[in-house]
């Protein structure tokens, strides 16, 4: 976010020109003055309209294997692919390897080989993703090279928050610190590209209180901010774009996730969207620790809506009188307030003691 008022004013005045100059041509027909569902619908339509080439899963012609051998290279001119969820090439185990030769691949579960991981697990889509014909199940944006055994360990486990290397956590799976942002941005892409088939609530564990409609688990929005886009992801996005015709917008700019679903504020890769969101920067709530009242500053009471969530994501009842909120009836604990003005939202955390 830009912090100085003079800079903010300048950016606000120049925003229409900056948007044209710095946002990639691929997004030229998207209205980035929109937020929330409006922006989500426009991006969803773009991904559908530009997905002009459906890649077969396995074929004597160009198939998903061929694309992954290029898109998932560790780096240019490398002979190894990067294995999602992997973290150690130096020990005697192969299931946790981070890289592997591009031709050490098999379609079946084989020790020491890599195969194709569906990040949005096939069985968690509704209907399930299939690979016997080109379509949602063969969308390469959702496929990653993975060690066969690691792929089997992940299986169709839902993703859950964690830390450190990847691994099973109870009945869930943590993708690892290196890959959690990758996973989040793939899940977001799949939701926009196949909105009724690949709903994030079916694959992520925990509250979805950040998003106004409760349709995006907080864990993915957290990961999108905590694990920034890597050069590997950017190159992969370019390669898949050259084959399929469409892009993953959350790799191009992770800030788009914030504009649609709120949550933590990630980097604005284009440097123009965050500076245009001046409305959300003018709203404030105080105090953040209280046992009686909160006050809202910077909005007209008749033009806003206010919701308060507990840590389970449940919407709570409260008394609102103009800019004054009575929270004295809430139990002690941490809460999230969502203030929405027009199509923009802003979240605030506060503690009741």
Question: How does the language model describe each region?
Answer:
Residues 308-316, 335:
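Short, glycine-anchored, charge-dense loop/turn motifs used at functional sites
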């Amino acid at each position: 976010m830009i912090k100085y008022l003079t800079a903010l004013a300048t950016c606000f005045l120049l925003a229409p020109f900056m948007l044209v100059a710095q946002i990639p041509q691929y997004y030229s027909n998207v209205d980035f003055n929109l937020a929330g569902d409006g922006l989500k619908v426009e991006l969803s339509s773009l991904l559908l309209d530009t997905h002009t080439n459906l890649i077969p899963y396995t074929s004597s012609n160009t198939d998903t294997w061929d694309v992954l051998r290029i898109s998932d290279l560790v780096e240019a001119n490398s002979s190894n692919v990067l294995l999602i969820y992997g973290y150690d090439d130096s020990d005697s185990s192969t299931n946790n390897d981070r890289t592997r030769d591009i031709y050490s691949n098999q379609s079946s579960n084989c020790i020491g080989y890599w195969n194709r991981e569906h990040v949005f697990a096939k069985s968690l889509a509704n209907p399930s993703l299939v690979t016997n014909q080109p379509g949602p199940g063969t969308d390469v944006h959702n496929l990653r090279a993975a060690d066969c055994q690691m792929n089997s360990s992940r299986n169709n486990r839902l993703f859950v928050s964690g830390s450190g290397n990847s691994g099973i956590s109870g009945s869930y799976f943590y993708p690892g610190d290196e890959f959690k942002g990758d996973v989040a941005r793939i899940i977001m892409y799949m939701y926009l590209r196949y909105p009724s088939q690949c709903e994030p609530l079916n694959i992520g564990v925990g509250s979805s209180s950040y998003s106004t409609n409760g349709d995006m688990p907080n864990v993915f929005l957290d990961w999108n901010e905590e694990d920034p886009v890597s050069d590997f992801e950017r190159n992969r996005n370019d390669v898949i774009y050259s084959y399929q015709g469409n892009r993953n917008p959350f790799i191009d700019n992770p800030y788009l996730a914030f504009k649609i679903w709120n949550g933590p504020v990630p980097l604005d890769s284009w440097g123009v969207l965050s500076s245009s969101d001046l409305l959300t920067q003018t709203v404030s709530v105080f105090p953040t620790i209280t046992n009686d009242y909160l006050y809202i500053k910077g909005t007209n009471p008749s033009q806003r809506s206010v919701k308060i969530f507990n840590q389970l994501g449940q919407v709570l009842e409260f008394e609102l009188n103009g800019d004054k909120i009575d929270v004295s009836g809430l139990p002690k604990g941490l809460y999230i307030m969502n203030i929405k003005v027009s199509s923009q939202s802003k979240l605030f955390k506060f503690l009741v003691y």
